[in-house]
Structure formats: C-alpha cells, structure tokens
Amino acid sequence: MQETKGQKGRGLFARAMRGSAFTAGSYVIAQVLRLGSNLILTRLLAPEAFGVMTLVSVVLVGMVMFSDVGVSASISQSKRGDDADFLNTAFTIHAFRGTMLWLATCALAWPLAQFYHAPELAWRLPVAGISLFISGFNPTRIETATRHLLLGRVTLLDLISQAIGIAAMVGLSMVLVSVWGLVIGAIVGSLAKLVLTWVYLPGPANRFHWDRTAGHELIHFGKWIFLSTACGFLLSQGDKAIFGAYLSLEELGIY
C-alpha cells in the first residue's frame, strides 16, 4: 500500500514538473512570437494604430480583471471540481460574464471615445469586445485539465491559438493596413482557442445549468481574488489608462 502511494506521489510530481516545463517553455515562445509580430506590425501600421489598440486593450483587460470572481481557481481547488453540475454552473457563469462584458464594451464605447478624444474607439471597441463574448464560452475542460495536471496539452493549445491570432493580425494588417487588422486578429485568436479547447481537451461537453449551491461556492470563493486582480490592473495597465488621456494616439502608440 505504501509503495503504491509512493509511486502515485512520484507520478504526480513528475506530471507537475513536465507541466511546469511546458508552461515556462510556452511563455518564452509566446514572447518570441509577440516580439517578432511587433517588429513586423510596426513596419505595416502607423503609430496611431497602436495607440488605438492600446486603449482598446486597456479597456478589455480592465473589464476582464475587474469582473474576475475566481471561477477558474474555484474549480481547481473545489472538492466538486469534477462534478458535472458544478462545472456546468461554472460554464453558465462564464458565458453570462462574457456576454455582459461585451454589452458593457458597447455601452462604454462612446463615453470612452469622448474621454480619450479618440473617435475611433466608438466603433472599434464594440467589435474588439466580441473576443470577450467568445472567450465566455470556453469550456471548463481547461480548468479540469489544469486540475488534473494536464498542463502540457493546455499550454500547447494556448500557444497554438496565440500563433493563429498573431498570424491573423499580421496577414490582415498587410491587407487592410489599419488597426482593424489588429482588432479582427484578436477575435480570430479567441475563436481559435475556443475551437481548439472544445475539440482537443478531454471531458464532457458543457451545457447551461444552474446549481444554487455550486453558484454560491463559485462566486463566494472569488471575492478576495477580485481585490488582487484589481490591484494587478492598476500595476500593469494604470500607466496606459492615465497617459491615454494626455498623450496623442501617435505618442501613446510609441509609448
């Protein structure tokens, strides 16, 4: 019995180490891809395009981080993390959140365009917000795979979806020669992740369902995570949010 437990423990440790190696490796590759794409895109688009996309990214990242209630973390640590009702309730929360975030981008687009003196935001922000709507329907198989330390597969699919999104940005920017290439490319990347995770991650398909006990646990768990993500936004995006109100789009794009 002790030998069996020891073998199981060593197996979990080895799986965790492999997953960590995959995660670290994919991060390095993602940074290289991002650097390469930026070098190409700077030759295709004017600085104003990057300024507009910076403002779009600040808004989208802010909405995602300020609405984070820790559903993914709750699935990973909960005793009910493999229960179908629990997972479907989490999926329902994710889908509702993604839909509301997209509607919020539509509602905030015009006021933010006025605040930042960037009329382009009025119609580009709602389109970019479609990526939040799409991401809301990502399957809970992602969290389940992470829970069971299938990190290699998760990081590989995430890396592939990023590569597809970057390729779409570069290709569309070459054709459109405008910020629309960046906006649509981001949507393509979100759609690629949705399809890849639904097709290639193991587990039952999600459906809309509401379990009151599960919903309370999922939302209650994340009340402290909200505070940490809010602080994270201020540290990572606060400078862009502030400078965007004082710099021109060209200057912000260069920054």
Language-model-detected regions and their locations in the chain:
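Interhelical loop/hinge segments that connect adjacent transmembrane helices in multipass membrane
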Residues: M1-L12, A16, G152, V195-S236, ...
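Membrane-water interface segments that mark the loop-to-transmembrane alpha-helix transition
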Residues: A14-R34, L55-V56, L60-V61, M65-W110, ...
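Residue-level recognition of pore/gate-forming positions within transmembrane alpha-helices
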Residues: Y27, Q31, V58-V61, G98, ...
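Interfacial/gating helices of multi-pass transporter permease domains
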Residues: V32, N38-V64, E120-W123, E217-F221, ...
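Membrane-embedded alpha-helical segments of multi-pass transporters/permeases
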Residues: L35, L39, R43, F66-V69, ...
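Helix-loop interface residues and adjacent transmembrane-helix termini in multi-pass membrane transporters
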Residues: L44-P47, A84, F115-A118, H148, ...
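Membrane-interface junctions at transmembrane-helix termini in multi-pass inner-membrane proteins
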Residues: Q77-D83, I134-D158, V175-L176, W180
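Hydrophobic alpha-helical transmembrane segments
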Residues: A122-G129, L157-P202, H220-F221, S228, ...
